[in-house]
């Protein structure tokens, strides 16, 4: 089960609360890295300005998972799904050609989505209107191939 919590602070707070309330379940924190990652996820979250999150006691290393650099990066793993979702007017050929989507900066991800979707049937990309619909359409096999951190997440899939 995936529970979207909203902003980063709420997500971490909800993760910690879920750990307390569901001690027998394997709870995973999944957040945007918001930048390049050169360390373990918990170390990245502990050192990231704005987070400084301490790994809770009795929580395994693999219970922190990152979308590098942002959730929207994952869309580029399956450009066919993006093109099908937005329909006519979507400029799929203008998307970055990088095969490792984690190497595309957050700024370039949003710039490319904005440009490619500007004349699309669904209109310009908006996270609240399009983000969660789109993420459901991404092929997990393509995502694992394009993102080492997504591959790590799927390796840890417990159910």
Q: What annotation goes with each model-predicted range?
A:
Residues 1, 9-159:
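C-terminal accessory helical subdomains adjacent to catalytic cores in phosphodiester-
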Residues 5:
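RNase H-like polynucleotidyl transferase catalytic core
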């Amino acid at each position: 089960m995936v529970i979207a919590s909203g902003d980063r602070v709420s997500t971490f707070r909800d993760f910690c609360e879920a750990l307390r309330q569901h001690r027998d379940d394997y709870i995973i924190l999944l957040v945007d890295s918001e930048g390049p990652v050169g360390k373990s996820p918990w170390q990245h979250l502990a050192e990231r300005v704005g987070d400084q999150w301490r790994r809770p006691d009795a929580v395994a290393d693999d219970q922190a998972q990152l979308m590098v650099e942002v959730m929207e990066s994952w869309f580029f793993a399956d450009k066919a799904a993006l093109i099908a979702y937005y329909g006519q007017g979507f400029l799929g050929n203008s998307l970055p050609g990088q095969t490792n989507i984690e190497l595309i900066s957050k700024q370039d991800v949003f710039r490319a989505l904005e440009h490619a979707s500007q004349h699309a049937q669904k209109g310009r990309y908006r996270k609240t209107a399009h983000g969660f619909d789109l993420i459901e359409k991404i092929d997990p096999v393509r995502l694992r191939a394009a993102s080492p951190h997504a591959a790590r997440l799927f390796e840890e899939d417990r159910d």
